[in-house]
Amino acid sequence: MRPDCTDFRQLFLDDVPMMDMRAPVEFAKGAFPGVVNLPLMNDQERQKVGTCYKQQGQAAAIALGHQLVSGTTKQARMDAWVAFTQANPQGYLYCFRGGLRSQIVQGWLRDEAGIQYPRVKGGYKAMRTFLLETTQQAVAQCDFVLLGGLTGTGKTDVLHQLDNVLDLEGHANHRGSSFGKRATAQPAQIDFENQLAIDVLKKRARGCEQFVLEDEGRIVGSCTVPLELYQGMQQYPLVWLEDSFANRVERILRDYVVNLSAEFIAVHGEEDGRRLFAERMLQSMANIYKRLGGERYQRLSEILRLALEEQQRSGAVDLHRGWIEGLLNEYYDPMYAYQRAAKAERIEFAGDAVEVREYLKARARRQPHH
């Protein structure tokens, strides 16, 4: 029989399949990529057992648990666990601390199905701690450089051409600006942190000791950059990406209008997709109402509304350039110019996409600064 697992590093490096015994409410707050939630108890059962534990102690709580998870309920769950073990013979099971819940399921599988299936010692809590430490160690030990630039210069396009990138926006499923929400939901905060840590772990295992990050705020949509990394980002050196105003307008039109509306249609179907896309765009503009001021907001949101109507009617997106140009000229560029001035002494290189990409590749080949 395979022993219970204590080597968390290998679990994540190899994407080892795992089944999570915790209740759905616990799982929803955060788990690990690719893990399957096959709970011992559902939310209501867990709540009842928890109340019983507080009032009558452990023995009574265990007895109630066995009573609640019995008969056809137990059989249905057993069938799901057995199917998982057969589909994933190299996998593991875990619960919150690697304690009672995983041991009960292990025992049932062994005694009633003849299956020896190992658990992760320390459970979710130990793996989560390991991943938090992974990110902290990288911040302490590795070399970081930030990629900055005005809105629409194509920072994400450049990042996707490098292999030593930590893609915060990718992990957060958000483009980082007021208009950055995607058609699909963002991950829970814990899932975001865990994905980021596993990315770090895998890249360091390949020998990567220098990372490129986009110059972000602390908040990427609803996800928050881990504090130790964000603190580092206040002092890491910067590489500044430059492009013409016209190119930037076209790129924003592509990413935030053409591609995003296609994303909404792919997720929600033609009719709902178009409607939800239009609602999202108007809401994104409304979200920066205070920062734009009343007059500017009225003018730009009216251009946006007319552009959305024209897009709905004919599929043409040309009118969108009006509000994009206005937002860049009157809102984003002045804000970024101020930020760039504040960070000027940290900028070690500036150039177009090709120059910046080559500079960052050459920089990664140099010895780390640490």
UniProtKB/Swiss-Prot annotation:
Its EC number is 2.9.1.3. It is an enzyme of class 2 (transferase). This is tRNA 2-selenouridine synthase. It comes from Pseudomonas putida (strain GB-1). The active site is at C95 (s-selanylcysteine intermediate). It catalyses: 5-methylaminomethyl-2-thiouridine(34) in tRNA + selenophosphate + (2E)-geranyl diphosphate + H2O + H(+) = 5-methylaminomethyl-2-selenouridine(34) in tRNA + (2E)-thiogeraniol + phosphate + diphosphate; 5-methylaminomethyl-2-thiouridine(34) in tRNA + (2E)-geranyl diphosphate = 5-methylaminomethyl-S-(2E)-geranyl-thiouridine(34) in tRNA + diphosphate; 5-methylaminomethyl-S-(2E)-geranyl-thiouridine(34) in tRNA + selenophosphate + H(+) = 5-methylaminomethyl-2-(Se-phospho)selenouridine(34) in tRNA + (2E)-thiogeraniol; 5-methylaminomethyl-2-(Se-phospho)selenouridine(34) in tRNA + H2O = 5-methylaminomethyl-2-selenouridine(34) in tRNA + phosphate. GO terms for biological process: tRNA wobble uridine modification. GO terms for molecular function: transferase activity, transferring alkyl or aryl (other than methyl) groups; tRNA 2-selenouridine synthase activity. The keyword Transferase applies. The keyword Transferase applies. Gene3D superfamilies: Rhodanese-like domain (3.40.250.10). InterPro entries: Rhodanese-like_dom, Rhodanese-like_dom_sf, SelU. Monomer. Residues 12-136 form the Rhodanese domain. Belongs to the SelU family. Keywords: Selenium, Transferase. Involved in the post-transcriptional modification of the uridine at the wobble position (U34) of tRNA(Lys), tRNA(Glu) and tRNA(Gln). Catalyzes the conversion of 2-thiouridine (S2U-RNA) to 2-selenouridine (Se2U-RNA). Acts in a two-step process involving geranylation of 2-thiouridine (S2U) to S-geranyl-2-thiouridine (geS2U) and subsequent selenation of the latter derivative to 2-selenouridine (Se2U) in the tRNA chain.
